[in-house]
Structures are given as C-alpha cells and as structure tokens.
Amino acid sequence: MNIIINGGTRGIGKEVVSFMAQDISNHILVTGRDEKALNSLSAKFTNVKTFALDISLFDSTREKFIETISDNLGRVDRLINLAGHLIVKDFLDFTNNEARLIMETNFFGTASLIRALVPMMPEGSHIVNISSMGGFQSSSKYKGLSYYSASKAALACLTECLANEFKEYGIIINCLALGAVQTEMLDEAFPGYKAPVNAVEMAEYISGFVLTGNKFFNGKILPVAIGNP
C-alpha cells in the first residue's frame, strides 16, 4: 500500500509513521519541515521516503512534490493529513499574519495538497483529515484557540463537501476530530496539562482507521475523545 503522511516529523504524525512502517509492504512518503527529523525517519525505516515541505507554502513546491510522488510511489492509496499549526492567543491580540499562518497550514495548504494528489488516487483510496474537538460543533471551546478551532472546523466541513464531490472517483474521505493528546505541541501550548491519551496510543488508533475506516465511513467527522474535548 502506498501512503503519504503529511506532517510526520513529531508528535502523533511521527508515531503514525512508526506504526505504519512496521508493515514492510507499505511504501510511505513523509512530509514535514524538520529535515533532520525526516532524515532520521528514512534512515530508520527502509520503506520510508521523505520530502521537506512547509504545507503553508505548498503551491511553491507543488510541481517538485508531484514529481517526487510519481517517481517513488506512482499512485497514492492513503493520504493522512496531520500537519498543523497552533498559536494560543486571545482573538483581539492576533495579527493578520498569525491568523493567516494558521489558516494556510491547517486548511488552505491541506486543501491544495488534496487537490494535487486526487488525480493519483485510485478507486477505493482513503483520505483522512486530522481535525480537533476544538473545531467540532457544540464541543467546548477554549480561550486563545479561536483561529485554531476555526481552521479545524473548516477542514471538517471541507471533508463533508469533498466526500460528495469524490464519489464519482470512488475516493473515500473522512475526518477525525481529536481530543487532547500528550504531544510536544500540547506541551508548548499548555505547559503542565496532562492529556488522557498519549501520541503512541492515538497513532495506533489513527493508523487502524486509515487502513480500514473507508469500509464503514465516508464524509464523516468522527470525534475521538474521552471527554469534551
């Protein structure tokens, strides 16, 4: 199976790579901004290739990225969109550049990546967007997460729209709205907070869903949380 993991250099994404790479029949391409971390992954796993990518600037490297996918994979059976950016700040204190960076990373860049890869995805392939309970309708909302939550809500809604558009291609797309997970990003944003789930546990769940969830769901926004969030 040919798998692209968008945002796989740390946290949940890194653990998803580790889990998926255990099956040597999987051919994986991992994207991320941290080239040192990417090199470490490709050195550790023989079935992992990497591509240095800032998803917020995807359009500037689109042609090179598509060429890399064509050379290394040919087709894409699974796409996991994990790349994300979080700034914790009161809405009134945000600058336009900070707000745009969140939206470019969490929504526009991911949407551009999907648009570029769909022509390479066969019938029966599966796209999984990783959203957040912060963007899940009627979930608890938290101070300082206005733009982050809005970007994740946009990604969830896009998932529903694309499920309808991609029916003619036989491509399945779903969205997992994650609750709090103990990761570097959570530690940086909320020092001292202890989440009920760690990155390894969540990665195992996500990996299983990526492989088999397309048999049971399409266009669904599924909360993956013990509490709210």
Predicted regions and their residues:
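Substrate-binding pocket helix/loop in short-chain dehydrogenase/reductase
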Residues: D90-F91, E98-R100
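Conserved NAD(P)H cofactor-binding loop of Rossmann-fold oxidoreductase domains
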Residues: L82-V88
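C-terminal helical subdomain
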Residues: C175, P191-P229
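N-terminal Rossmann NAD(P)H-binding glycine-rich loop of SDR-like oxidoreductase domains
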Residues: T9, V17
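Rossmann-fold cofactor-recognition segment
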Residues: F45-D59
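Catalytic loop of short-chain dehydrogenase/reductase
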Residues: V128-A154, T159-E160, N164-E168
